[in-house]
A protein has these predicted regions:
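RNase H-like, Mg2+-dependent phosphodiesterase core
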Residues: 1-221
Length: 221
């Protein structure tokens, strides 16, 4: 086992402490200059089976390997969802509130599927709990308990699974968007900043999917 291999150690500890289910949560697209931010959620029960072979944080996997793992992760997690906040919502609300909105939408999708979210413990990647305040702003949404862990996407299998779900979902959206708004090379850059992406904005102007507040000032004109 290498340092990059996640385990179920934290999840099983939460189950021993009484959690009825664990929801791994991770986001993708936080730093992009085009497209939505996506939050993946993977739901796991105390009888969780061995994770798919080769599962890792999505950032450590090739695009091909993520696509190969995606159906395995969907089969492994009893329930899953991906919530989105659009580029316009990120511009209007800011990235942290946008992340919260996307996560709330994902949680609402789980609730609609019959998942007892209020009995869950959410494992959130990072040191900052941006989810609890978002839930507090939505009194009609079920509120799970949230715990944070730095490098959870690397170390915790539930969060690694969520990262793959979010990354594949968002990447597919950006590839489709490349056909609608050609020229920005979204099939390759997935909406993230690069010299060629900024050059395309200078040449074509910003599209309806760009985050205007995130663009470098010279690229706006």
């Amino acid at each position: 086992m290498t340092a990059a291999d996640p385990t179920l150690r934290m999840e099983r500890g939460l189950f021993r402490d009484g959690a009825a289910l664990v929801i791994g949560v991770d986001e993708v697209g936080r730093g992009a200059i085009a497209g939505p931010v996506a939050v993946g959620l993977g739901v796991f029960l105390p009888d969780v089976k061995r994770m798919p072979k080769g599962l890792r944080d999505s950032k450590l996997l090739s695009e091909q390997r993520r696509e190969e793992l995606h159906p395995e992760v969907l089969a492994w997690a009893p329930h899953s969802a991906v919530g989105l906040a659009s580029n316009a919502e990120v511009d209007t609300l800011g990235i942290i509130a946008g992340l919260g909105l996307a996560a709330v939408r994902g949680i609402e999708a789980l609730v609609a599927a019959g998942v007892p979210v209020e009995a869950a413990v959410v494992v959130l990647d990072g040191s900052h709990d941006w989810l609890t305040p978002a839930l507090a702003d939505c009194p009609d949404t079920s509120r799970p308990r949230v715990v944070t862990r730095v490098k959870a996407d690397r170390d915790c299998a539930s969060v690694a699974a969520a990262s793959v779900l979010a990354k594949v979902h968002r990447d597919r959206l950006m590839i489709d968007a490349d056909g609608v708004h050609p020229g920005y090379e979204w099939t390759s850059n997935k909406g993230y900043a690069s010299a060629t992406h900024y050059a395309a904005i200078d040449r074509l102007g910003a599209s309806a999917l760009h985050r205007w507040s995130w663009l470098k000032q010279p690229a706006l004109f």
